[in-house]
Structures are given as structure tokens and as C-alpha cells.
């Protein structure tokens, strides 16, 4: 017997019961994006490797250790995208979408990073992101945060996420702070673990991200990034905080928040949760005013965020498991008896014509009424439509509300109106 071929480690199948929940979550996210005037952009999964090296930074963990990179038959180096912003900027430049224009874009799709698989962190994961080009004020930063806050309310998880903010200032301010931080770390190098020593030499601000509790204590005495901000960045950050206060969005200023990619400047933010263990970041982003020019375009202010859908789905399932009840089947058509299947098919199509949003599943596999009602329950149906030989002959159907147990026999022409009444 041939050996079964398994999915690659860290790259998961999502089965129908799971995808129904995912679709409900994604639909909610897309509706909110549309309400803010954002347009979808669809991007390739594979890009030229230099795109990510230039955008993310060659000494970041993503580029150094996590990218899936390979040579194609022409010898060109290609990479499965590890994130979405770089490709979105590349597309904007290539198609002339950015210069002297304002764009609000969103994307969704699989990303790839070679990491140790664990709950909420996989080698193939799905990310949704939004990017705004052509706006440099703190008001658009606030809009993105307000958009995400509206997501959490729509998903019923607003009490389980918290907003953290910081400003890393201009590139010049970052350089000044980096020098001060490296000087501090060198004084205490004997207290650093191997990973932080490496980061001190390659990307010192990433030391601030350490999860090592001993080094976190050490960093309490480290220079504070906000002390090195330029005046414009301070004004920008103050403006953002004022707008969030006005909107009633609570937040915490986290002076160690820097994000993991080199393209950020000024605003950085994360929505975090305590409900997912070590994978606490649900959504993160910030401003990247220099990236468009860095990738060959004209200087264009930009800000955006990205969110891992696996983590979001886990969080919604943990705190609001009934959220996707609406994704279940509305009605299940139970049909039994000689010659009834043809009539069941006709009735199902009639009901779909009359109620375009109706989620109706028809039993085509035979079986007793008891087995068919079991299938209806398995699919979460609210209503069972029972069509036997006598009902088919009389042009009727039994409508049974599975939540209350009430049932009634109706003419088939009246069923759509009754379904609409029950389902609201």
C-alpha cells in the first residue's frame, strides 16, 4: 500500500466546519473596510527576493531566517511573500497608483514564514492588511486604529484586546536612539542572552522586543525612545493621542514597542490580548513614510497594518464562540419516498429564487426521517422542511422550527414567506 502523503508541517488544511467560521469573520472584516472606503488589491504570492530584502531589512529575523526563497529555472531568486506591505507598495509603484494620489487599499491571503509551528503561528498563515498612501497627518493613523476598533466590536471581542502605541520618530531620531541604546547594551553585555547579543550587533532596537524576563528588568534602566524624538514626530504622536482620546479609544503608550520590520517610522501600534498565551499580538502596524521612495517610487507618506487571521479566529472562537451561528444552514430539506427527490430539487430551487440569502441544504442521500433530522441538526439548521409522498402529492410541505419544536403544514407557495418570518 502506498504511503499517505501528509500536509507540510505548519501548513494546515481548513475543513468545511472551520471555513464556515472563517468566512463569517472575513465577511465582517470586509464589510467594515468597505464602510471606510477601502478597495481590495490582489497581489502575487511570489515576488522577487530583493523586494523583501530592501523593504523589510536584510538583518531582520524575517529575511535572515524565515523566508522561503528559491531560484527559478532562469536562476532568479524568488520568495514566497512573508508579509503584504512590500508587495502592495511594489504594485502601487508599478501601476502608477501612488504619486500625488490618495489610496486606501486592503488585501488578504496566505503568507509564508519558516518558523517553529505553534498555536496561532504557522509556516503558512493568512493575513489581512490595509494601507493608506498619500496622507501624512495623525488623523489617518487614527482612522486605521478606529477601523480596527470597529472590527473588534463587530466580532464581539472588544473587551479582550488592548491597544499599545509608540512613536519611533524620524530616521534621524532612530539613529540617535540606536547609538544610545547600543552604548547601554555594551555596558551590560554580560547580562544579555545569545539572541540579544546578536541583535545588539545587527538590529539593536529589536532587543526591546525580548521575552526574556531578566533582560526586560535590565531594560527598565535603558534609554527611552521618546526622549530622542524630533519635534515633528512628537507633535504627530501627540496629535494621534488626542484624536484617540476624543474618540474614546483607550490605549497604553509602550516605549519598548518598535515592531519587527525596518521600514517603520513615527507611529507604531499593536492590539494585544492575554487570551492566546505567548502569541499575544492580534494586529499591528504603523507609519512607513520612506518605503515607497526606498523601493523606487517618489516620496509618498504611508501608514498601514496587518493582522494574522489564524490568531483572530482563535480569539473569536475563545471569547465569542456563537459569533458564526449565522454561518450555519438556515433550513434543511428532509425528503423521503418514491419520486420525492425530483420534487425536492424543484422546491429547493424555487425557495432559493424567492429568498436569495437563504442557506438551504437538501438531503439527497436517502435515509430515514430520523437520520435526516440528525443531519439537519449536525449542520446547525434552524428549520426542517419535511417533504414526503403525501406532502408532494398535495403541493405542501411541513415547516418545523427546530429551536421551538413547533411545526405546521403549508402550501409550497407560502413557504418562502414563512421562512422569512421565522428567520427574521
Curated annotation (Swiss-Prot):
It is found in: Cytoplasm. GO terms for cellular component: cytoplasm. One of its GO terms (molecular function) is histidine-tRNA ligase activity. InterPro entries: aa-tRNA-synth_II, aa-tRNA-synth_II/BPL/LPL, Anticodon-bd, Anticodon-bd_dom_sf, His-tRNA-ligase, HisRS-like_core, HisRS/HisZ, HisRS_anticodon. Its EC number is 6.1.1.21. It catalyses: tRNA(His) + L-histidine + ATP = L-histidyl-tRNA(His) + AMP + diphosphate + H(+). Keywords: Aminoacyl-tRNA synthetase, ATP-binding, Cytoplasm, Ligase, Nucleotide-binding, Protein biosynthesis. It holds the Pfam family tRNA-synt_His. One of its GO terms (biological process) is histidyl-tRNA aminoacylation. Belongs to the class-II aminoacyl-tRNA synthetase family. NCBIfam families: hisS (TIGR00442). Homodimer. This is Histidine--tRNA ligase. It comes from Sodalis glossinidius (strain morsitans). The gene is hisS.
Amino acid at each position: 500500500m502506498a504511503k499517505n502523503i501528509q500536509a507540510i508541517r505548519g501548513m494546515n488544511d481548513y475543513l468545511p466546519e472551520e471555513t464556515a467560521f472563517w468566512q463569517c469573520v472575513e465577511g465582517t472584516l470586509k464589510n467594515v473596510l468597505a464602510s471606510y472606503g477601502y478597495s481590495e488589491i490582489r497581489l502575487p504570492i511570489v515576488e522577487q527576493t530583493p523586494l523583501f530584502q530592501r523593504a523589510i531589512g536584510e538583518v531582520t529575523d524575517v529575511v535572515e531566517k524565515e523566508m522561503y526563497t528559491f531560484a527559478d529555472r532562469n536562476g532568479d531568486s524568488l520568495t514566497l511573500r512573508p508579509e503584504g506591505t512590500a508587495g502592495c507598495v511594489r504594485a502601487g509603484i508599478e501601476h502608477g497608483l501612488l504619486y500625488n494620489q490618495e489610496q486606501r487599499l486592503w488585501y488578504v491571503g496566505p503568507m509564508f514564514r519558516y518558523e517553529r509551528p505553534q498555536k496561532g503561528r504557522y509556516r503558512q498563515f493568512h493575513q489581512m492588511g490595509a494601507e493608506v498612501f498619500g496622507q501624512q497627518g495623525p488623523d489617518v493613523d487614527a482612522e486605521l486604529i478606529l477601523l480596527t476598533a470597529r472590527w473588534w466590536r463587530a466580532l464581539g471581542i472588544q473587551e479582550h484586546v488592548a491597544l499599545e502605541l509608540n512613536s519611533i520618530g524620524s530616521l534621524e531620531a532612530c539613529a540617535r536612539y540606536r547609538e544610545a541604546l547600543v552604548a547601554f547594551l555594551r555596558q551590560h553585555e554580560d547580562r544579555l542572552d545569545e539572541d540579544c547579543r546578536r541583535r545588539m550587533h545587527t538590529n539593536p532596537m529589536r532587543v526591546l522586543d525580548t521575552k526574556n524576563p531578566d533582560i526586560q528588568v535590565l531594560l527598565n534602566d535603558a534609554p527611552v525612545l521618546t526622549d530622542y524624538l524630533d519635534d515633528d514626530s512628537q507633535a504627530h504622536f501627540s496629535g494621534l493621542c488626542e484624536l484617540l482620546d476624543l474618540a474614546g479609544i483607550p490605549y497604553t503608550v509602550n516605549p519598548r514597542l518598535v515592531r519587527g520590520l525596518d521600514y517603520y517610522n513615527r507611529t507604531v501600534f499593536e492590539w494585544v490580548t492575554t487570551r492566546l498565551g505567548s502569541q499575544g499580538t492580534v494586529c499591528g502596524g504603523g507609519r512607513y513614510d520612506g518605503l515607497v521612495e526606498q523601493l523606487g517610487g517618489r516620496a509618498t507618506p504611508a501608514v498601514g497594518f496587518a493582522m494574522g487571521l489564524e490568531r483572530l479566529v482563535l480569539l473569536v472562537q475563545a471569547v465569542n464562540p456563537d459569533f458564526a451561528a449565522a454561518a450555519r444552514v438556515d433550513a434543511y430539506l428532509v425528503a423521503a419516498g418514491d419520486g420525492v427527490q425530483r420534487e425536492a430539487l424543484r422546491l429547493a430551487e424555487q425557495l432559493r429564487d424567492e429568498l436569495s440569502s437563504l442557506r438551504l441544504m437538501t438531503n439527497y442521500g436517502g435515509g430515514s426521517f430520523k437520520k435526516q433530522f440528525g443531519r439537519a441538526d449536525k449542520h446547525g439548521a434552524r428549520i426542517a422542511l419535511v417533504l414526503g409522498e403525501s406532502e408532494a402529492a398535495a403541493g405542501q410541505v411541513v415547516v418545523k422550527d427546530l429551536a421551538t419544536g413547533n411545526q405546521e403544514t403549508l402550501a409550497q407557495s407560502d413557504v418562502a414567506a414563512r421562512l422569512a418570518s421565522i428567520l427574521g
